[in-house]
A protein has these predicted regions:
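Short, well-structured active-site flanking segments
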Residues: 99-112, 212-220
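Penicillin-recognizing serine hydrolase domain
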Residues: 16, 34-62, 154-242
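Active-site helix/loop module of the DD-peptidase/beta-lactamase fold
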Residues: 108-124, 165-178
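Active-site SXXK
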Residues: 70-71, 84-109, 201
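N-terminal Lys/Arg-rich, disordered targeting/topogenic segments
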Residues: 1-14
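Conserved catalytic neighborhood of penicillin-recognizing serine enzymes
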Residues: 116-152, 233-242
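Hydrophobic membrane-insertion alpha-helices, especially the h-region
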Residues: 13-28
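Short pre-catalytic segments that frame enzyme active sites
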Residues: 36-83, 99-103, 115
């Protein structure tokens, strides 16, 4: 009788062990299958993406296309060569502003804000929320709106915003990036407003996307009401028209 009980318990234990092995085996098989499938899918996507760029004539002097999920480079051209950033500089000015000050703050436009090339969208003495000026900076590439944000930053924080823009670039190992102006316009001495390589710009954009993605959301509007419900400003990015 005792032997039958022992044999029965042994049989049950063996059965449990076999069941556990089967469950674990199925789990690892499923995991490996999914892992291999995902790897193969990713390789196919990479191959297809690269073929698109290989058959496309990129006219820009420098460019880079990076998959943000794993930093895989799909395409690059002179990606480590520093170049003038022009209005890309505004994006970083705006990012530093929203990282330190509320968009609800009131800003009065000064005479100096409108005394530059590309000004004329806003006028001295007008009052705006920081959010309004941010939208003008991002959507219309307004130099006067960007200047008003930068000036207000300096008056409120007590530091020139360009210093903080450069500090952020340095702290994040964006070695090729350097700013001289908040708008990207050249200095009075003729130096570029900002310089940086496509690779470091891609890194900078990833940081902005992870920290304050609304910056990109705001710049995606084709048009926005600004001076009133019947008056709108149009995005300078013509790709949004398509």
């Amino acid at each position: 009788m005792m032997r039958k009980i022992i044999n029965k318990e042994l049989f049950l234990n063996i059965g449990k062990f076999i069941f556990l092995v089967l469950v674990l085996g199925a789990f690892f098989f499923d995991y490996n299958y999914k892992s291999n499938f995902e790897k193969e899918t990713r390789r196919t996507e990479e191959k297809n993406a690269k073929s698109v760029f290989e058959n496309t004539d990129i006219l820009a002097r420098g460019a880079i296309v990076v998959r943000l999920s794993d930093d895989f480079v799909l395409y690059e051209k002179n990606s480590d060569k520093p170049m003038e950033l022009a209005s890309i500089t505004k994006l970083f000015n705006d990012f530093v502003f929203v990282s330190n000050l509320p968009l609800s703050m009131d800003i009065k436009v000064s005479e100096a804000d409108t005394r530059m090339y590309g000004a004329g969208v806003i006028s001295p003495g007008e009052n705006f929320k920081a959010l309004d000026l941010l939208q003008m900076s991002l959507i219309v590439s307004s130099n006067d709106a960007t200047s008003a944000l930068a000036r207000s930053y300096g008056e409120t924080i007590g530091r020139n915003i360009v210093l903080d823009m450069n500090s952020f670039a340095s702290n994040n190992q964006l070695e090729s990036i350097y700013f001289n102006t908040p708008t990207g316009l050249p200095t009075d001495g003729g130096f570029p407003g900002g310089v940086g390589s496509p690779r470091d710009i891609a890194k900078m954009l990833k940081i902005i996307n992870e920290t304050y993605p609304d910056v990109f959301f705001l710049s995606s509007y084709e048009r926005i009401p600004f001076f009133g419900p019947d008056e709108v400003v149009l995005n300078t990015n013509k790709a949004l028209d398509k």
